[in-house]
Structure formats: structure tokens, C-alpha cells
Amino acid sequence: MFDFSGPKYTVNLFVPCHMDLFLPYGVQPVLSLLQKMGDVPYYNSELTCCGRQFLLRGEIDTAQELAFRLVRHFDNGYPIVCPSSDCIGYLKKYAKNLCQHSGVPAAVAHVVQDSYELCDYIVNKKHVECLNNTFNHKVFYFRSCSARNIYPSDDAMTLLKNTKGLELVTDPEMKLCCCGNGDFALHNGELTDLMLKKIVDRIKTFDVEFVTSSDLHCLQYLDAYIATRNDVNLNVVPIAEILNSEK
């Protein structure tokens, strides 16, 4: 178990593996946001995998082991915040079944019921809809599959709309998937590229400077694809950076 002696923590911060491995600097804006709202976040850099990719590959035993590890370490009464809707949506949907034989039903219920994507936590747990942040750019918000289906929420758009200087662009008709399932992309490269092309080409028509999302995995796929296109002048930015921005 983790050592919770010392500071009086108020929230657990769970950083998913795709942020820890490919976007480690992205943790700081999240920590800063939580601290600005008066929270004292507990963050353990060794706890970085929800097990989603293993379950998608059919590796049930590993998925169960990782889910139980999260349940065990977050059994401390504090809410759990994750800056990516795919991971938190996965935990809410699958943790109960994966940990049904864990022998700690109360701890499992805590993870399922008291886990939040970052924007959801800010709006619905802290009851804050305006962070007094500034981001003087035109931004497209990509609502990923996890944000539409697994973890439906408009909280990200609420916070973006209340960002000073930000011109928000959305597309309710966009129902495309970014293929943020690593196993699918690995075995279906051409189809993945085609779907990403359709997304990026559509976003390009809005003449925006940035694209953001509450789903970090999707942002990484979009960023990697955009890097292959010389005709696309589009920057990918995690939503926490926008919400923590002062310029």
C-alpha cells in the first residue's frame, strides 16, 4: 500500500500509461489545476496502467490484476481523477466485473462511483465552470468515442466555452472514431490511417489552430497522423494545458 502519512491529501491523481510514457510533461498542468482548486493531490508515478489495452486484447488475467491493483491502492476515501476519458470510462464500466472476486466490494464501489475524468471533476465535484484561464486561439474540440459512449459528458465543452479568448469549434455530426485501441490500429493500419484522415480533413475545413480532447489516447493518434501531413497546420494540445493557460 502507499504511504499516506504527511500532507492531508484530498484527491488521488491517476495518470494513464499513454500520458506517462508519451506525454510526461502533461502531468504538471493537471497537478496545477487541482492545486488551484484547493486540492492536495496524491500522485504515485508507479501506478500508470488501468489495464484497458489488455482487456481489449483478451488478456483477462492481466486486466483483472491491474484493475485490482488500482482498487487496492485507491481504497483511501479520496476521489480519483484521471485526465483521460478513455481510462476513467473503462474503469467505471469494467472494474466491478473484473474485481468481482476481489473480496473488497466497498473498495471496488469506491473506484466505480468516485472516479472522474478531469473536466467532470472540476464541473461536477468542485462545482466550477469557469477557471479564469485564457487561451487566445481558435480550437476544435474532438469528442472521442469514450466521451460519446463510455463516459458521456459535456463538461469539457463547458470549461472551454468559459475560457477567455478561446474560439470554440465543435462538430456534432462528427461520429468518427480515432482508433485509439492500440491493438486495432496495430492490425488495421490502413483502415486506421483512413479514419484519421477523415477526421483531420474534416477538422481542417474549420480553419482552426488547435485540436483538443478529453481523450489523451485519441490526441496522440491524431498528433502522430498530423505529423505525416505536410498540408496540415494543426496543433494538438491536451485540454489540461488549455485550462491551466494564462495567455
Where are the language model's segments positioned?
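Iron-sulfur cluster-binding electron-transfer modules in prokaryotic oxidoreductases
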Residues: 1-247
